[in-house]
Amino acid sequence: MAAIKALQEWCRQQCEGYRDVSITNMTTSFRDGLAFCAILHRHRPDLINFNALRKENIYENNKLAFQVAEEQLGIPALLDAEDMVALKIPDRLSILTYVSQYYNYFHGRSPIGGMAGMKRPSSDSTEELSGKKKVPSQPAKLSSPVPTQRLPLSPARTNPVVQRNEGVSERPSPKAAPGTVGSSVSSICGVCGKHVHLVQRHLADGRLYHRSCFRCKQCSSTLHSGAYRATGEPGVFVCTHHSSEAVSVSPKLSNLASRQPGGGIADTRPIGVSQKVLETNGEATPLRARTAAWEHAGGNRAAKGFVQTELTPPATSRVHVGSPAGPRLPMSTVTTTSANSKATTHVTNSSPVGWSSSAQSSTGTSGSRPVVSPSALGAHLSVPQGQAASKGVKTQLNSSTDSSSTAPTPAWTSSSSRTQQAREKFFHNLSPAPAPAPASSSSSHASRVPTVVTAPSGKVSPLVNTSTSKVPSATVVTVPTSKASTVVTAPTSKAPTVVTVPISKAPTVVTAPTSKVSTVVTVPTSKASTVVTAPTSKASTVVTVPTGRGHVVVNTSASKVSGVVDNPAQESSREQALSVLRKALPGLTRAGSQAPSRSSPATSSVLITLPKNEVPPKVPSAKLSHSTTQAFSPTPKMEPTAPLSVGSTSWTSVSLQAGKKSPGISPGIGKTSAVSRPQAEVKGTSGPGPTSQEGQEEGPEGWRARLKPVDKSIPSARALEQKEPVLAEPRAGDTPRKASSSSDSSIHITLTPIQQKRTPCLADSGSSLAAPSPPSRRKKLVVPPTLDVSADWLQPELKKQDDQTRSCKEKTATWGTRESSAILDNDLVSPDEAVTSPVRLHPNYISQEELQRQLQDIERQLDALELRGVELEKRLRAAEGDASEDGLMVDWFRLIHEKQLLLRRESELMYKSKDQCLEERQLDLQGELRRLMEKPEGLKSPQDRKREQELLNQYVNTVNDRSDIVDNLDEDRLREQEEDQMLESMIQNLGLQRKKSKSFLSKIWSSKSKSGQT
């Protein structure tokens, strides 16, 4: 009781002379708030105008005192103005603890909350103040002024008996359940919603928190005094080192997440519509902005934005092919433009891999195809899915291309001149030397699919099925025949290879319906200006071979066995030529028979395959590869390549030169015929060959002469096959191809038009490695046929080039690293320099790791003290008015003192950390400022002068901040010493009085016992 009376006496002395202030106890005497204001005015008259205060304004008086003490003196508000209004008898222990902070501060700084890191708002709104004025003093009619909590009133507020017995406003008594009875709004944590005891209290921004709950919003670490700041959101605090941008975004994200039941943002996309579709539509609006559009569009949104298809698109219109039911494929647009920008083809494809023909036709796009019976295969113009008609043939297509292929288009009249005119106009709009483009297809359903020949164009990618997603574009022109329809595709400038028309249910591209098949082959070369096709009879074959100077159209006719190009050669001559080839190339016969659908000529070649009833002799191909499932891609500098192969079980090939005239082709009739165009990829070089003006040699010597350049480039092609995965990797359009084995046999005939002064480079057009010179390479390739040419003879050169490239990259990386390090050295301080800096060499320097460790130790000690304080608080409230209260109060003050010591140490560490940062900042500013000042005035630019002034201002502010920290630390030490002395003396006096009382009672009892004995 002595300590409580001493504190009460101190308060009475401080409030002496102030009107309407009378300190008779430590409960009701402080209810109106004038006593708190009087103590503050006594020591700091500049903070409060006491004459303006009125006794009846309980809320305003208490609010003013608590606010000024917290903001100006750093004393945390353990009390709340609302509780002072609501309760007739305030909590005695809370008032004792709070007033003791006043006493400690004015005798030496030591508030429970430590430093005043966060300040409460300067004033609340006028509406809240007016509401507080109208609050009656009757506790039964009082409601909480804080609308967000909406907690029920405690019995301490409504029950006068509880008020009288407990005297509690914000603390529950041991006789009542904690957190329910005696709890008020001010005793509830703003984070966890649980009751806050006196020793745990931490008020920030007008809200009460557990010290352990008061954490950073960003890093979730406990906020220390002076090391946190408020944000725009109420009750949200962050560490001082966090950026303001990240803080401002986090509340919005949390609000968005809180709107959904699971804490996440619900997906507002329509059912069945993927996010990829939304992205391909080009919608840049956020998800919430798109919600309204989805509500109006409903399920048709995908059809409106994703598939843009017309029922009757013109031949030159931009065709969008796709379906909303497709499994999440983005819409891709292929735009091909010729060199003179006259012929342009737009193709848009979004069909996924594996779509069936029925699915394509059901989309209502231009991907539908006519169904033609085997008996009446008319010549139709059909635009497959992913293809668009070229503008160059608009006049020839007329109205037949206007339909979207729900019904087949009418057949053309068989007119080769008409086709010739269309081709001339088309190739006139294209570049004069289009690069080669291979084509590929498989054969099946021979009775329902026509034979198709595709012409190459530009940069190529392998021909894929119409049911695949990568569909190239070309112009498709058909020519009627008697028994089978033939489709000829014209090339575009830089478009991928062409997909043929899907007929009936055949998943493959091209087949021949019967053994009596008419075939139209169009093979343009790099300088070809015209392509002419002509209708044929039952078993006739028309092959058009444009050369550098023109084109040759040859009609051949045979019964069921042969089809001949141009002038028919004797059968004996053909056999002699084949025997010469076998003798000249003995080592390649096996490879040619095992690898039918690969071709890698040194120059551009055309591989034409016709069916044959019986298996021909194994003739080695000059440029056949080992697999039909891999693809190469030629360079743009090479000649156009259009290899055509008939799917069969056995394959042979004959390489011919088409630079002179069209040679003979081995005839044959097969069950089915498929058109495939293996991609040729050449690594070697080819020297000048015969020009197109030379006459054709029909004998075996001419064949051998024409085959020599091809023979020389064989090792390079074989070596290229070993490097195929690396060279063919950049081409995403390359797809595996397999030849169908529906026919008995077939034969490959390669037409190789050779032009002078052609030097092909590496197959990879994007490669930066240059090929060796043609003469030296040609000399290396002249080797005996019996010599075993290793497939990896080019590897040393490639390794050397790879090493050069790797070393160049390493040098670049090293240079970039050195440059980066140089930049860092100019702008930042390296770790070695930071260690040797004067700040870190200071004997009192504390590293950040050590600071964090000490702060964690203080945190643990504070947690232990809070547990002790909670138990001691319960005992104090239970022993109110008892003889043991005095001893418990002494323990309480000691516990508060220990907590104050820990908070002091925490404040010192925070001061120390801030001071070290300022010192390092000061050194940096000083160095930069000296460099600017050492520069002559005549050489200084306006930017230098401006920067110098800014640095000078920053330097002065830094020095002032450091001085303030030192002054605050000195003042704190002095106040702490005085406080410790006052507290120790008070405790000692309390202990002496207790000892005296005990000794006095013992003397009385001892005297009584002595008198009784006598």
From Swiss-Prot:
Keyword Cell membrane: yes
Calponin-homology (CH) domain location: 1-107
One annotated Gene Ontology cellular component of this protein: neuron projection
Stretch list, region Forms an intramolecular interaction with the C-terminal coiled coil domain keeping the protein in a closed conformation: 1-261
Biased composition (Basic and acidic residues): 701-711, 720-737
Modified residues (Phosphoserine): 110, 144, 154, 250, 773, 837
GO BP annotations listed: actin cytoskeleton organization; actin filament polymerization; bicellular tight junction assembly; endocytic recycling; neuron projection development; substrate adhesion-dependent cell spreading
Low complexity composition-biased segments: 356-368, 399-419, 438-447
Membrane topology listed for this record: Peripheral membrane protein
Segments forming domain LIM zinc-binding: 187-249
Record's subcellular location: Cell membrane; Cell junction, Tight junction; Recycling endosome; Cell projection, Neuron projection
Subunit structure: Interacts with RAB13 (GTP-bound form); competes with RAB8A and is involved in tight junctions assembly. Interacts with RAB8A; competes with RAB13 and is involved in E-cadherin endocytic recycling. Interacts with RAB8B. Interacts (preferentially in opened conformation) with ACTN1 and ACTN4; stimulated by RAB13 activation. Interacts (via calponin-homology (CH) domain) with the filamins FLNA, FLNB and FLNC (via actin-binding domain).
Entry comment, domain topic: Exists in a closed and an open conformation due to interaction of the C-terminal coiled-coil domain with an N-terminal region including the calponin-homology (CH) and the LIM zinc-binding domain. The conformational change is regulated by RAB13 and RAB8A. Adopts its closed form upon interaction with RAB8A and interaction with RAB13 causes conformational change from closed to open.
Name the record gives this protein: MICAL-like protein 2
Name of the gene: Micall2
